[in-house]
Amino acid sequence: PTGLPPEAGSGGHAGAPPDVARRFGPDGATGVRLNTAIRGGGTAVHDEKAKLGLASVGLDWRSRDVRLSGDLGYQDNRLERTRSNVTLAPGVTSVPTPPDPASNFAQPWPFSNERDLFGTLRGEWDITPAATAWAAYGLRRSKEENSLANLTVSDATSSAGTVARFDNTRKDKVDTGELGLRGKLRTGGIGHEWVAAANWFRLDLRTAFAFDFANSLPNNLYNPTFHPRPDFSAATFVGGALDTPTRTGLTRLTSYAVGDTLSLANDRLLLTLGLRHQKLDIGSFAAGTGAVQSEYSASRTSPAVGATWKATRQLSIYANYIEGLTQGQTAPPPSGAAPLANAAQALAPFVSRQKEAGVKYEADGIGAGAAVFSTSRPRAFVDASQLFSAAGEDRHDGLELTVYGTPTRGLKLLGGATWLRAEQRSTGSAATDGRRVIGVPEFQATVGAEWEVPAVTGLALDARIVHTGSRYADDANTLKVPGWNRLDIGARYLTEIAGRLLTLRGRVDNVTDRAYWASVGGFPGAGYLVVGAPRTFTLSASVDF
């Protein structure tokens, strides 16, 4: 089909992203898909502008035993006067009330331009009816340049603060590949679904920055003061030349894995056993000079174990445990409106561990699940000397409930809730040990429903309620950020015009135009605040040919 879906949204944002797909040749063996998108204009936030250009083409060919596919795309994403996040300065003892969700306290000159070229190639060959080999390759070439002016609030009552110019450039090259073989067989009464695979990944990162933290300008969250774009002062913290960024990171990962899922007890018990060997080489380098800041080379063979018991045709019980070698966090240039002593330095790799156990039930169009899980990773933070480092761990233990399905004809439900205990452990400080991790709520939930209106053929209405509990904006848990609720609604209408299927969609997010802090935190140890989007309208139409 060919889709021609014009779109329009709040603030004059509009676009027309056609999507064309066709199959050719005997038995439709060859396929092509072309997608382009041009969107631009204002947003629901005052004076904020966004423009997106996207083009991608996909080709595939298939025979009885072979499948080949390739995709290539380009994206150009431009933002102007994007509303910044909000950092709380040291000494602030409370969290400011969020501003009007449509207000914009950003300076007139911040922007971000990002361009990405991406592509994939994949081939599969059915060697026998029970064995398939595959190979895949992917790449991404990205370039970004921006000029930012994030607000640092020094008085929570008045929300007075400052902004400073912070410019960045980034170029990165990502290459990844995979070779594998999978198949099925039986040994006696035991079924096997086995796999062997090799993966590799390479990231070459080049960055430069200029942060004029000493030349701050007054601003206010509620009553902003706007300034012309300042020139950089002599005290600017500089990392390389913005027009010629140098290598600041090089990551290489190779991985070899084998696994087998055994089917036992007449396929009621599934047991998965796996091993993965990883080798991780990481280098981080000072922007501009290229001096080595840290180099790590680590390898590890890690297990993966899982089991599923089909207690009945409707009920399954499962558990799994996975380990993996993971790259450490990388220090950002500034933190808390001040430069870091080891900007762009990577921390040591670590072994991540994840445990999960749960139940799933599905019958008569209704499904539900419950799971408990636990994960841990080193705790990264910025110490008193503005050094990005690690001490202790962040431990996440949680319970997740989900429900989905069609309880009655024409009514679809989808919902979930998560209770999470996220603690900092073994931090070496009584002020933070046992405290909650920045930005993680103890409870969050989403409930959505879609209803096909019986009296109007083709019309469906939907609604969604999102709840996020309170969070903390600092390691010591003295800055509590209130929780929030949001209501989103929408409608979809399907009809035929001149024999063509026409789909009309309308959506309103944040119906009540609630002001709230949507998220807290970002890079590890940071508690910056992000204002939630205002009431936003979106309309679209698509025609299939």
Task: Describe each model-derived feature in a short phrase.
Residues 4-8, 18, 34-40, 70-76, ...:
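Transmembrane beta-barrel strands of outer-membrane/channel proteins
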Residues 9-84, 109-132, 276:
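Transmembrane beta-barrel wall of Gram-negative outer-membrane proteins
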Residues 28-30, 65-68, 130-133, 189, ...:
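Repeated loop/turn-to-beta-strand initiation elements of outer-membrane beta-barrel proteins
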Residues 78-92, 202-206, 295, 304, ...:
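Surface-exposed extracellular loop regions of Gram-negative outer-membrane beta-barrel proteins
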Residues 120-142, 164-285:
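Face-selective signature of the C-terminal outer-membrane beta-barrel domain
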Residues 122-126, 132-138, 142-150, 317-318, ...:
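Membrane-embedded beta-barrel scaffold of Gram-negative outer-membrane proteins
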Residues 170, 194, 319, 355, ...:
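Conserved C-terminal beta-signal and adjacent last beta-strands/turns
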Residues 266, 367, 372-376, 389-475, ...:
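Gram-negative outer-membrane beta-barrel transporters
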